[in-house]
């Protein structure tokens, strides 16, 4: 079988599962199709509407016409948690006339990367994804509970960067790393965050589209691995009232495409003028992009909590209270860490 996946605007995997022969046939006759409305579908299954409870006709045809899923074969991978051989491939969404679907997240990102390419810039990103492991919770009316690890005990205190606290779930993370290796998801460091059974996994830095695809696949991978170990994994921004929220910190830098030099760095002032302008752009447009940074009602519980989620667009060197932190002032590591986005 082949899973044809497309990330919707909430990062949920939509698509179709096809027999291999039907998948191959669909490559020639464009029969891999879904309704256009998937890109205005919310995480709860409803549809995004405007203030008058109308669908946004500028990005949606009221007849809910088909769109075509075009596989991006650079993303084809084995699905490692199935017993039967199964492949997965991320698809680009195109209209029936062959034009890109404008509200597909991959279309938007490709357009942005083309703008950088025209300026001879090469953007580099590295995500840090936080999440919670929790006991299975089939009834959402009940609050989430901290799971029990290998020791048979439930974590009660805050174990920020605790090694043994991570090792409580070592069998799970062994599977996560193995699954990721099979899928070419380049995860790096894991550490315990300040919440009970709250973890963070870092990704290797690289191309923004490739990293976006990897994070999309990683979330699905972690959830499946957790289920195997009779746990749930959640990327909710604020899943438990008395625990810290979960963030998706995005480290970002710019290289000169020709000589691969970090153009955020200046020998004279350490921070280049272009980097200051870049930060200014983030400060200007982040408030307008909060539906992206905080897409759900729950997202704002994280931002208004008393924990270390930033509630500003200030920047500072090594300052975690700022929305935009500069972790290093050396040439190789000169970058901006956007700390505003939730993990959802």
Go through the PLM ranges and name each one.
Residues 1-189, 211, 231:
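ATP/Mg2+-dependent ligation/transfer catalytic cores
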Residues 7-10, 26, 39, 210, ...:
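C-terminal accessory/tail domains of diverse enzymes
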Residues 78-85, 123, 190-194, 243, ...:
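Short glycine/proline-enriched loop/turn "hinge" motifs that connect secondary-structure elements
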Residues 89-95, 199-205, 252, 338:
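Short, hydrophobic beta-strand segments
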Residues 129, 193-201:
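Short, conserved phosphate-binding/catalytic loop or strand-edge motifs used
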Residues 142-151, 248-256, 313-315, 320-328:
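Short beta-strand elements
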Residues 151-172, 178, 260-297:
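C-terminal helix-cap and adjacent tail motif
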Residues 198, 203, 210-280:
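Acidic, glycine-rich loop-and-beta core segments that form the ion-binding/anion-interacting portion
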């Amino acid at each position: 079988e082949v899973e044809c996946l497309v990330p919707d605007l909430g990062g949920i995997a939509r698509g179709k599962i096809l027999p291999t022969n039907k998948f191959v046939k669909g490559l020639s006759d464009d029969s891999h199709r879904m309704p256009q409305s998937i890109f205005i579908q919310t995480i709860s299954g409803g549809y995004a509407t405007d203030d008058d409870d109308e669908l946004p006709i500028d990005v949606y045809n009221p007849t809910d016409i088909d769109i075509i899923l075009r596989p991006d074969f650079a993303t084809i991978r084995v699905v490692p948690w199935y017993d039967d051989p199964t492949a997965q491939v991320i698809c680009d969404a195109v209209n029936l006339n062959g034009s890109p679907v404008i509200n597909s997240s991959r279309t938007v990102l490709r357009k942005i990367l083309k703008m950088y390419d025209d300026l001879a810039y090469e953007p580099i990103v590295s995500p840090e994804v936080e999440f919670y492991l929790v006991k299975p919770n089939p009834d959402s009316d009940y609050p989430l509970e901290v799971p029990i690890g290998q020791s048979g005990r439930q974590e009660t205190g805050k174990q920020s960067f605790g090694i043994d606290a991570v090792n409580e779930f070592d069998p799970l993370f062994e599977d996560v790393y193995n699954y990721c290796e099979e899928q070419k998801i380049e995860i790096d460091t894991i550490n315990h965050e300040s919440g009970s059974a709250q973890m963070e996994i870092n990704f290797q830095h690289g191309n923004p589209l490739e990293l976006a695809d990897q994070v999309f696949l990683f979330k699905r991978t972690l959830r499946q691995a957790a289920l195997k170990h009779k746990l749930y994994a959640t990327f909710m921004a604020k899943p438990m009232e008395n625990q810290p929220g979960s963030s998706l910190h995005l480290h970002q830098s710019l290289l000169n495409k020709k000589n691969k030099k970090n153009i955020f760095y200046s020998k004279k002032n350490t921070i280049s003028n272009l980097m200051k302008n870049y930060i200014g752009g983030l400060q200007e447009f982040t408030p307008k992009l909060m539906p992206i940074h905080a897409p759900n009602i729950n997202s704002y519980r994280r931002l208004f909590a008393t924990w270390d989620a930033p509630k500003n667009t200030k920047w500072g060197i090594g300052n975690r209270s700022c929305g935009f932190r500069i972790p290093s002032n050396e040439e190789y590591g000169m970058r901006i860490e956007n700390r505003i986005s939730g993990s959802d």
